[in-house]
């Protein structure tokens, strides 16, 4: 037999001696688990926090860094099963064994692997009570040290931890953005990328933003159609960067539509919020969301959940649901927090609900919490209460005092503009010298949005103050001059259309002072060659809002549309056509431009939102363009039924606007395209709408008397006449073949009375109703809204009305208010001569 080596015999002997001398140590050594698996299995068997804390107490001396991570993970899993998360989080956070676990993590975090480190950070943040938890700070620092080796999944989880701490602008988030940028080409995990996109969205350039959008489009087909969270993150990213990118939004919307049965209140609420912000319209989703949310009404019996339901469902609910929501909110109103009351007020504004009882209850909650609101929230409160016609001196006095105190201590341009805007909306919008000096101090740092907001506010003050504060008005006029100076300076220093576009996104051209608007148009013309398929829709939308006719810009837009039509998303077409309609302008290649646009949209007519299709049809009608396919798509029973359904979920004012545009389109087609044989079906609507026509104001009565003198008596002129198809004519008279006025006889109306319909039929052409050779004359006084801002060029709606009146047999005389109020017509005699020239001479229009 082979002899055992001496060193082995010695080793065994020593071990046996050790066992005899230290039986306790041997026992501990013998029964200590070699693997961490048994402890993890024990943790997984815990069914509540008490069991977990008992486990931690028993094993705190032997828990490894991995087991510490598992303990945090298990506590979070148990926490998510609770109905009252906040209350239970306090219980966990205050438990002595949670502090034990906290200390263990503090001692062992450097030994943790990357996944465990980030997971412990996430869970610790969920339970953290202190604003600056030392463990959280240590974990973030350690993660920063390891950042370069994180894979994209871990990077996204870590970025979410930073986002939870509101570190969107931190150097660390910037480092994450840099890593994403460097690795974008090889990234294939859209789920993780979409989370990162949201978290780094505050730091990225426009070029990087477009790269992320392109990458998302490439990877979108790699995700399952049930990946709602990915679609939500993508939509949220587009919201954060203010980019209404139609193709991606549609793909996200398709995911939401296919999973709507699985969406909860929180998800639907967030999706609707994104759609509202980006002005993305999805009739199908809203209808399905409305049904789902309505079913939740009986289930939401807690203020937090009911407020969320009220905000999401209220603006799209039907009359009965709105009534139910408001009555329930009245019962809960006293239990609202300040944040919830603000959300309810915003929803009431969206609903255009002026329920005085609910407004009173909500404002009483707002009043209690007024000191805790931030400037932007105070602006929202002011805007909504002004819109809802709320009047309570005590509330507005406190609001004004609070806004002024904020203003005196604010040095951030955007914040100052928000505060000034809110003050200008108050019942007494006066601003003292301290306020004016605060505006002047931030002017050099202001962007176009801030400058435009200041200008609008100052104009409100001048309008309010000019009657009794001459000295202050002079200072306000000087402030306007400074605003103009800095606005021009900013525009002249613009070196990129992309950067300019960013500032234009939230601007409305009709709020721009005249001189600044001219400079803006000149700047856009300077960058005209940079207008392309990506930005043409945005530029067109801005021009539509300016009422400023720039033929150079419109020609460029038309050229881009024709040459790059295949790259333009079809749903951008209505925005591209709109400025031509509003400004009544035909580009050189008019027929090719309009034909190309309509052809590009034809295959999408069935899926375009109904009200957008109506607006498009109306825009084309003002341009005398009537594509038969489009009109057939609108004027059929199926489409009109869809439109009726959509009108129920629109706000009252928007619904009324859609109905009015449909009527105008119907009227235009009947008058200008009788060959299409589309019936007129708006008699009842027009009768209801025109019930609101009141008597003549002072200026109209003055003109009426002058016309009566010119024509030979008040029985020779009519005011506020309704024509067939319900056009309203300011003044009407009839001349016989010898240019002699014909009296109306028994049809004469007294001053200020509602006129009768002049003709019985809404269909007949009126020429046959007159004596041979006689002519019916319509005198139209055009205010500033009827003309372009820069030249006396008639806008689209006024031009269309003139065409219609001529089809109905009128000779149309249009007089602009600029001509009527000019120095040349400053006396009554001059005006009388002018009217005689217009009516009896050859002058048909002063334009």
Swiss-Prot record:
Tell me which InterPro entries the record gives: FAST_2, FAST_kinase, FAST_Leu-rich, RAP
The record's subcellular locations are:
Mitochondrion
Quote the function comment for this protein: Involved in the down-regulation of mitochondrial MT-ND3 mRNA levels which leads to decreased respiratory complex I abundance and activity.
Q: Which GO terms describe its cellular component?
A: mitochondrial matrix; mitochondrion; nucleoplasm; ribonucleoprotein granule
Q: Which PANTHER family match?
A: FAST KINASE DOMAIN-CONTAINING PROTEIN 1, MITOCHONDRIAL, FAST LEU-RICH DOMAIN-CONTAINING
Tissue-wise, where is it found?
Expression detected in spleen, thymus, testis, ovary, colon, heart, smooth muscle, kidney, brain, lung, liver and white adipose tissue with highest expression in heart.
Keyword terms: Acetylation, Mitochondrion, Transit peptide
Q: What is known of its domains?
A: The RAP domain is essential to regulate MT-ND3 mRNA levels.
Q: What is its main location?
A: mitochondrion
Family per record: Belongs to the FAST kinase family.
Annotated source species: Homo sapiens (Human)
- The disulfide bonds in this chain are none
> What is a biological process (GO) this protein takes part in?
mitochondrial RNA metabolic process
Q: Which residues form the RAP domain?
A: 777-837
Give the signal peptide as a residue range, or say none if absent: none
Q: Which residues carry this modification: N6-acetyllysine?
A: 360
Name the UniProt record assigns to this protein: FAST kinase domain-containing protein 1, mitochondrial
**GO molecular function terms listed in the Swiss-Prot or TrEMBL record:** RNA binding
What Pfam families does UniProt report for this protein, alphabetically?
FAST_1 (PF06743), FAST_2 (PF08368), RAP (PF08373)
Transit peptide is among the record's keywords: yes
